[in-house]
Amino acid sequence: MCVEILGSGHRDIVNGSRFYDEQQRGLGNYFASYVYSELESLVVYAGIHVQCAGYYKMVLKRFPCSVYYKVEGDVVKVWRILDNRRDPHWVDSQL
């Protein structure tokens, strides 16, 4: 199994990193490192998470975000990493 992060997922990580750097210098790098580490865990744990709008949803523990992904054969495709504090209707519109 391998993990592929789509362009939208990379953009979400960059945007999240910028947001957290504005909150505290260095926090953005920590956010990005943590998210990439969690994405690597999908090699083992892909498919065990709750499904939402046709995507698996992995809720992150250290930041209020969720990873939305699909499993296609032996590839985990990461579509979005979205803030859980957003309006649920907005989240649905992004998927």
Q: Where are the predicted features?
A:
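Basic, Lys/Arg-enriched alpha-helical interface segments
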Residues: 2-56, 72-75, 94-95
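A short catalytic or substrate-binding loop motif that flags glycine-/basic-rich loops and adjacent residues
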Residues: 59-62
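Enriched for short, Lys/Arg-rich terminal
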Residues: 66, 70-95
